[in-house]
């Protein structure tokens, strides 16, 4: 799935989480991916996916759909409970 993100948001995400939004593209294009709808988001429909980036590192990606593209909102390292959920789910 093609993806896009705001360069300013990328800089903010890098400062906050130490991870670039660029990594989200690799996660969303990985076949071993767990995705749920983020029911806590208000306004637009958002999804949370966990999977491996192109470097083989587990990442959590928050995104919304804009047409045929995934608009990446956030990428971060997973919490221990998210790692377990991924390992049990795939």
Question: Model features per residue range: what roles?
Answer:
Residues 1-90:
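Ribonuclease/tRNase effector modules and their secretory precursors
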């Amino acid at each position: 799935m093609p993806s896009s993100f705001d360069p300013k948001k990328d800089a903010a995400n890098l400062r906050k989480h130490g991870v670039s939004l660029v990594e989200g593209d690799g996660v969303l294009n990985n076949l071993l991916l767990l995705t749920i709808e983020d029911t806590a988001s208000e306004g637009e429909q958002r999804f949370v996916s966990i999977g491996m980036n192109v470097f083989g590192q587990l990442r959590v990606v928050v995104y919304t759909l804009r047409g045929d593209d995934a608009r990446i909102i956030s990428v971060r390292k997973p919490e221990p409970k998210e790692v377990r959920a991924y390992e049990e789910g795939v």
